[in-house]
Amino acid sequence: MKSFYHYLMKYRHPKPKDAISEFANHAYLDHGFPKASTHYDEISSYLELNGDYLSSMTTFDEAWERYISETKR
């Protein structure tokens, strides 16, 4: 299974259209982001402590749900 970070990068966009695209752009610039992780708790904990660029954890939860549904096929 590819990492959440790898999945999220498909949403990067020079002119973000939505909150997930903004999240992807910021995660790309965040050198401490757990890039190899596939674990919700690890990424969620990291974002709660370091994800000041994330306006709401709901954005992460929505991106995580997409990740799970698309990578579990």
UniProtKB/Swiss-Prot annotation:
Pfam families: YozE_SAM_like. InterPro entries: UPF0346, YozE_SAM-like, YozE_SAM-like_sf. Belongs to the UPF0346 family. This is UPF0346 protein BLi02292/BL01432. It comes from Bacillus licheniformis (strain ATCC 14580 / DSM 13 / JCM 2505 / CCUG 7422 / NBRC 12200 / NCIMB 9375 / NCTC 10341 / NRRL NRS-1264 / Gibson 46). The lineage of its organism: Bacteria, Bacillati, Bacillota, Bacilli, Bacillales.
